Amino acid sequence: MKRPQRLAEGDLAAVLSAGGHAFVSSCSAESQVLAAEVAGAGDALGDRIFSGIFIAGLNRQVCAAGANGRTVTFFQTPELKAQGQRNRFLPLCYGDSVRWYAANPPDAVLLMVSPPDDTGMCSFG
């Protein structure tokens, strides 16, 4: 198992390859810091897809980088709808979204956790 990697500001483009698929912590665990890092990485991330459980009225950040970045969402938000073709809306219930992730596994997961302990374990709070 790969150990968690702590990122400093501006490191995202160096650790995420262009293209691919990243799950982004969202819903009530949205990180404005991560969304800003994705936006700041810009075109260096190519046509990378960012997916998550984005909720209207709660998640106002658009997690897409550069001109070719795309988002997949299971709940449509006004901010994502405004992205037009860059946003793929899949109106699935939670159970079906789990199956979608099983069929479309991300190659990266972006979330905030506590620093790892001596064994490399992290906590969500």
Residue ranges and their predicted role:
Residues M1-G125:
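Conserved alpha/beta enzyme-core scaffold
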